[in-house]
Amino acid sequence: MSPSSSGSGTSRSLTSNKVNSTETVSAPVLAMKPTQIAPSQSIQTSVSIEDIQARAQLRKKLREARRGLTNQQHTDAAKRIASRLRTLPFLDNSTTIAGYLVNDGEVNLTYFIESIWQSSHDKKFALPVLHPVCKGHLLFLSYTQHSQLVKNKYNIEEPVLSCKNVVPVRQCDVILMPLVGFDVNGNRLGMGGGYYDRTLSFTQRAPDSHSFSGSKAPKLVGIAHDIQEVDALPVAPWDVPLDAIVTPSRTLQFTKP
């Protein structure tokens, strides 16, 4: 089954079931608080007014550009990126992959997700949900053809909260991240909420790209249309750098310091 050709909506052709209310979350999930951000990495870290304004203006311009793509351009981008993702060695060797559901003109990952479901029985796919306890953080839940979905406060579909479906972020081998803008240095401009930066702050503190538990930190892969590239992004102290960026025309990989 093919995904919706438009990248600007949340409609999909998957067999997931939509629901209108959220399942009651039991104590184990509510108690799972993510690692706290150190003061030097706090989202409240000071940045100049000029940088804040520049990021806001750039975000507005790039969001308008990607929403302006035609349905055919969105479909072509989704197919090409799905093909490119399947060639990434570290993704092919992974067992748990996290992604996202399309919103606001983002690249649609449905082609890739369905290919994982159909051909890779040893791989688990996960989606982010707004954390029910820690404001501004994400929680990851497993996602299958039969997952029930509900729209969050941003009108984005996400799996219904359930303890048994929680996937700890440190168990994710790869996280495919939406973005608003990027540059060739691996910097990412998001929607401005800071959800990914807070949730993934531990990847910046992990020595030798490893988390404190000794397991490898997840590979962070930005997914974007080519028109979302800029010469140089204004970088904030809390921004989490990417390991790779995949667009319809190329794949960029980076070495973190």
Locations of regions flagged by a protein language model:
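Conserved phosphate- and dinucleotide-binding cores of soluble alpha/beta proteins
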Residues: T24, L30, T35, T45, ...
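N-terminal active-site beta-alpha-beta segment that forms phosphate/nucleotide-binding
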Residues: S2-Q171
